[in-house]
Amino acid sequence: MAEKNERAIKVVAENRKARFNYAIEDTVEAGISLTGTEVKSVRGGKATIAESYADSRGGEIWLINATIPEYLQANRFNHEPKRPRKLLLHRKQINKLMGAIERQGMTLVPLKLYFNEKGRAKLLLALAKGKQLHDKRETEKKRDWSREKGRLLRARG
């Protein structure tokens, strides 16, 4: 019998600073609307979501400031690297996110850009609140202490 070609989730870009700079309340998986050359560039692993954020415009959620560089093999039909990209969500999810942004002063921060099992580009969005400087220091102290604790336990045997 022929074996099935199992596709794993392939993470293309990750926003590692987001968990440090924001207190994450909730996460949502959103589809992302890309052109052909953008998909090829993302499959090559050349996307950056570190400085990006999501915002609502006209009842839709858009990914702003994400960088997907131009696809080198494309000619004149290439895309603009920093254009706003529409995120694909259900209306109920959009209303929930927009309400949290407007009422509670929260932010939509992208955490991961990846391809799911079906080969579709997905974005993991976090509904987050910005941390103050003392909160960031506290997080760093906890992380350092957990590392030190692990070292001490390993040293004792």
Swiss-Prot record:
Chief localization class? Answer: cytoplasm
Q: Which residue stretches does the UniProt record annotate as biased composition, category Basic and acidic residues?
A: 136-151
Compartments annotated for it: namely: Cytoplasm
According to the UniProt record, where is the region Disordered?
136-157
Q: Which Gene3D superfamilies match?
A: 2.40.280.10
Determine if Cytoplasm is one of this entry's keywords. Answer: yes
Entry GO MF terms: RNA binding
Task of the protein: Required for rescue of stalled ribosomes mediated by trans-translation. Binds to transfer-messenger RNA (tmRNA), required for stable association of tmRNA with ribosomes. tmRNA and SmpB together mimic tRNA shape, replacing the anticodon stem-loop with SmpB. tmRNA is encoded by the ssrA gene; the 2 termini fold to resemble tRNA(Ala) and it encodes a 'tag peptide', a short internal open reading frame. During trans-translation Ala-aminoacylated tmRNA acts like a tRNA, entering the A-site of stalled ribosomes, displacing the stalled mRNA.
Q: Tell me the protein family, please.
A: Belongs to the SmpB family.
Origin species, per record, is: Rhodopseudomonas palustris (strain HaA2)
Asked whether the UniProt record includes Cytoplasm among its keywords, one would answer yes
Its protein name is SsrA-binding protein
Cite the entry's keywords alphabetically: Cytoplasm, RNA-binding
State any GO CC term: cytosol
InterPro entries tied to this protein: SmpB, SsrA-bd_prot, SsrA-bd_prot_CS
Do you know which Pfam families this protein is assigned to? Answer: SmpB
Q: Which domain of life is it from?
A: Bacteria
UniProt-listed GO biological process terms: trans-translation
